[in-house]
Amino acid sequence: MERIGGQVKDQEELAKQVLSWITCAKRPLTTSELQHALAVEVGESALDEENLPQIEDIVSVCAGLVAVDKESNIIRLVHYTTKEYFERTQNHWFPNAETDITAICVTYLSFHAFESGFCQTDAEFEERLRLNQLYDYIAHNWGNHAREALTLCQQVIGFLESELKIEAASQALLAIKRYSGHSKYSQEL
């Protein structure tokens, strides 16, 4: 962490965001999910793709603490003891991580892309997933992050007041993969 702290401010901040997301994530994140998480600007109504950090930059600023699995495209801490360390010392290194992640999650779910509510077809839903890489993770886990947050952020209230955005998030919870390991989804219950 000394090496991370010795970087220029923007790189140090990026490294801490990466490490907090990887430490606090409720399941392993893909590189594209993490890129989207890092690119969200709280309070904005759309993702600015110019904010997507390059994977090489993400790995570099973390000073050897993270690695990308080439087969699964999962970004993770290099060793399980590193994860255990950050989980144990989370309040020291990332004291507001769950609050910050909650704000990012709810901002993402409040994007204009979800204002249409429930997708009418499987193809439309799959396209929504493809275009919004973090959507599935956030729809399933934003509530868990909110429950662990130190404070309730204003974005949660705004999100909960939008029936169509709630519908869109709920759809991701209800949709199931047709076949294990297959990218096709079905909305049939």
Task: State what each model feature region is.
Residues 1-189:
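Leucine/isoleucine-rich amphipathic helices and adjacent mixed helix/strand linkers
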